[in-house]
A protein has these predicted regions:
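Glycine-rich, small-residue loops and helix-cap segments
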Residues: 46, 57, 101, 141, ...
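Short glycine/serine-rich loop/turn segments
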Residues: 99-241, 292-294, 341-342, 427-445
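An N-terminal boundary/leader segment
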Residues: 3-80, 293, 309, 316-318, ...
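Short, conserved phosphate/pyrophosphate- and ester-handling motifs at nucleotide-, phospho-/glycolipid
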Residues: 46, 107, 247
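Immediate post-signal peptide segment of exported/extracytoplasmic ligand-binding proteins
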Residues: 86-102, 250, 280-290
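Long amphipathic alpha-helix in the N-terminal Rossmann-like dinucleotide-binding domain
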Residues: 77-87, 143-144, 153
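Structural helix-boundary/capping segments
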Residues: 13, 63, 141, 192-198, ...
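Generic hydrophobic alpha-helical segments
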Residues: 39-43, 83-86, 186, 388, ...
Length: 510
């Protein structure tokens, strides 16, 4: 097992004097709501101050961040200035936005103008983008207050947030265990109460899997509904951005704010922003919920039991359970680990020490390239670059990458047949609950299997989301994954809201 790095997170904070101040005043703002919807409603109505909301969340960060390490950077000064602007808008009678005063954490692979964006990699340590990602712009326009950049597996390559150059992010539910990945910092930030909302990216399950392991809601929307402009690319045909939240309504609220066409992203779907909140109370009566009969096996019994409980809850709410087949689903993991590394090997070629980021000086240009990339990239990133380069090489392209693309099409065809019979599909999000830190670090194949249920929807470009649905082994959260056809977010959120209501009725937390 490799040594665990517990980074001194103060290195990444813009301000050092706020920690003691916030710890001292940690209980001052105990009346702050926990959901983004309630916070925004209170700020807009004038019953809450955005600056008070922010200070309450900074106090929570000060109290627990040292144990969790959700953040690479907490942008205290910028957040306080943004919160003050929201309060000024309210006082002046201006519309502060639908997310007025809501603290939001951003995964550290999204460009933030003048604020470090590292992708948790030494090769980009200290790099400050000259522009904001479209999602960052839209959140700011909606009145959200960005509070920092969250930790991730380097360049979003991993399933545990152990592959960060800046240390491990620990699970707030049990700090001896992983938070999932690659958006583990974003999931942990919401689970720990550092922010009611965070934004992650999802290439093969990197929002949904950590959401399941941390017991929060995580959404990967349809490919192209949320702009990727300003997202540092891992695998461009698979990457998508989406929210984490403590409840379903908050994720709907955020998706409405960040979705919609963006001319800066050539893959952006030319459509209006998603409209989701109005469907949350509609129920699932008459909906067809698909059970995949040939789904890959191997999920823990506790996880399977919670999936069956979810089917029972939806049936009790009026849905019909139907069996569907996905014969190509068992090949999704193999296809993904050819396609994604192939795209990564191309996308990461730009980090060469010439234009930006780390440069290791050497005797000639080729030696500088090699030394820079050797020093700047971590082991998992190197592994995937080599795998992708091999798969794209002239002698092996047809045997590996070409076949993977054919499998990708077969999986899309399987989904099309399944959605002819069912409105949504239900699967586990992760085959296991959160595992101990270091348990799978030396076994990449075991780590890759954590995404066996999330990868297929990325290959097809469809929406999917994870909702917490009880607990499994060791009292740890279990997530259920809802899959829907392209642009099927409304029916997906109907089902999510129904599952959430059934958990509340049974006495479980949202």
């Amino acid at each position: 097992m490799r040594p665990l790095l517990k980074t001194d997170v103060s290195v990444f904070r813009r301000s050092l004097d706020w920690t003691a101040e916030m710890t001292t005043n940690a209980n001052i703002h105990s009346n702050i709501p926990t959901t983004a919807f309630a916070i925004a409603d209170g700020v807009r109505s004038g019953t809450l101050k955005a600056v008070d909301v922010l200070e309450a969340h900074l106090a929570q960060i000060a109290a627990r961040e040292g144990d969790i390490h959700a953040f690479n950077l907490v942008t205290v000064d910028e957040a306080r200035a943004a919160a003050a602007r929201v309060d000024a808008d309210v006082a002046a009678g201006r519309d502060p936005g639908v997310l007025a005063g809501v603290p939001i954490a951003l995964k550290d692979n999204m460009c933030t103008r003048g604020i470090p964006t590292t992708c948790s990699s030494k090769i980009l340590e200290g790099w400050r983008p000259p522009y904001d990602a479209t999602v960052v712009q839209r959140l700011a326009a909606a009145g959200a207050v960005a509070i920092g950049k969250t930790n991730l597996d380097e360049f979003a390559m991993g399933s545990s947030t152990e592959n960060s150059a800046f240390g491990v992010t620990f699970n707030p539910r049990d700090i001896s265990r992983v938070s999932g990945g690659s958006s583990g910092g974003s999931a942990a930030a919401v689970a720990a109460g550092f922010s009611p909302i965070s934004i992650g990216s999802d290439t093969g399950g990197s929002i949904r899997q950590p959401a399941a392991l941390c017991g929060v809601v995580g959404v990967k929307p349809t490919y192209g509904t949320v702009s990727r402009y300003g997202l540092v690319a891992y695998a461009s045909s698979l990457d998508q951005m989406g929210p984490f939240s403590t409840d379903v309504r908050d994720s709907a609220l955020v998706l409405e704010a960040i979705s919609g066409h963006d001319p800066m992203d050539s893959t952006s779907i030319p459509q209006a922003p998603l409209s989701l909140q109005h469907v949350l109370s509609q129920g699932v009566e008459g909906l067809r919920v698909g059970r995949i009969t040939d789904m890959p096996s191997g999920a823990d019994p506790d996880v399977t039991a919670r999936l069956e409980a979810a089917f029972d809850a939806l049936k009790a709410a009026g849905a019909t359970i139907v069996d569907v087949e996905m014969p190509s689903m068992k090949y999704a993991l193999t296809a993904y680990y050819l396609i994604a590394p192939a795209e990564a090997s191309s996308n990461l070629a730009r980090y060469d020490g010439v234009r930006y980021g780390l440069r290791v000086n050497a005797t000639d240009t080729n030696a500088m390239y090699s030394a820079t990339r050797t020093a700047g990239f971590g082991e998992e990133v190197k592994r995937r670059i080599m795998l992708g380069t091999y798969a794209l090489s002239a002698g092996y392209y047809d045997a590996y990458y070409g076949k993977a693309l054919k499998v990708r099409r077969l999986i899309s065809d399987d989904f099309a047949r399944a959605y002819a019979k069912a409105d949504v599909l239900l699967t586990p999000t992760s085959p296991i609950v959160a595992f101990p830190v270091g348990e799978k670090s030396d076994d990449p194949l075991a780590m890759y299997l954590c995404d066996i249920y999330t990868i297929p929807t990325n290959l097809a470009g469809h929406p999917a989301m994870s909702v917490p649905f009880g607990t499994g082994a060791h009292g740890l959260p279990v997530g259920v994954q809802i899959l829907a056809p392209t642009l099927g977010e409304q029916v997906m959120f109907k089902v999510a809201a129904s599952l959430e209501r059934s958990m509340i009725a049974a006495g479980g937390a949202k």
